[in-house]
């Protein structure tokens, strides 16, 4: 395990190494069982915005979900093939938000309505996106695939629709871990992403009441994540601010990115979910069949030859005693 004091030199080294790339830091105080995860995801959310041609409101809502899903990868074993799916189903105008993230820091997602109109509200005299209205009331579902057979699924009600609070509620209800979660996205006048990031603070068993109270007061006094990023603060700086006077130590790093592993074989497999007759009907009406990936927008095109491939597949299944589709 990487263990380094979060000194000025270490912070400089991190800045020199990651530069403008997105990444997550994991930090702990020297003497208390507390974990702090801080992620910068500006480029990742901007990639999602461009892929899905998101409106500013959709960018902020989906961006928060992306940041939240990346923070939730703290539940996964680092560097493995474990992954999780975060699904927000509200009755607001954006519809369903789906984000998938894995233990290697790769994330992808999509929203029901990428062109949702702008909804704003006044907060301390400043105009902010009204994410709660964009999302609406509904449920938050987290599906963890730990590579152990059946995935673990948890569903909790959305308590605010602001996404950060909803994730904290999920962690408390489903993981029995008291947590503070902050997620934020700031967009430029042209709709592009200026800042996106967030943090997750968890107090584990054995944390003293004094430290719990100190952390609670400190977190309540922190400015929004995007304001800290606007001041030039990087993930390690925010971690140090949260763990100030607790001898913060760096114990983990992870680069994050928008990544979709879809390919032609995966797309073809989705066609094979159709029966041979359904494929025949499809190609009687169309010269080519198109399969579009919801996560990245790639389009895969197939001709009638897939019908013969489907027949061959069914023939092999029959020979092996498997049930045909």
UniProtKB/Swiss-Prot annotation:
Q: Outline what the protein does.
A: Redox regulated molecular chaperone. Protects both thermally unfolding and oxidatively damaged proteins from irreversible aggregation. Plays an important role in the bacterial defense system toward oxidative stress.
User: Which keywords fit this entry according to its UniProt record?
Assistant: Chaperone, Cytoplasm, Disulfide bond, Redox-active center, Zinc
Q: What is its main location?
A: cytoplasm
Family according to the record: Belongs to the HSP33 family.
Q: Where in the cell is it found?
A: Cytoplasm
- Keyword Disulfide bond belongs to the record: yes
Recorded hits in Pfam families, A to Z, give: HSP33
Q: Name one GO biological process term.
A: protein refolding
Name the HAMAP family on file.
HslO (MF_00117)
Which organism does this sequence originate in? Aquifex aeolicus (strain VF5)
Q: Disulfide connectivity? A: 260-262, 293-296
Query: Could you state one GO cellular component term attached to this entry?
Result: cytoplasm
Q: Per its record, how is this protein called by name?
A: 33 kDa chaperonin
InterPro entries tied to this protein:
Heat_shock_Hsp33 (IPR000397), Heat_shock_Hsp33_C (IPR016154), Heat_shock_Hsp33_N (IPR016153)
Question: Molecular function terms in GO for this entry?
Answer: protein folding chaperone; unfolded protein binding
Work out whether the entry's keyword set contains Disulfide bond.
yes
**Record PTM:** Under oxidizing conditions two disulfide bonds are formed involving the reactive cysteines. Under reducing conditions zinc is bound to the reactive cysteines and the protein is inactive.
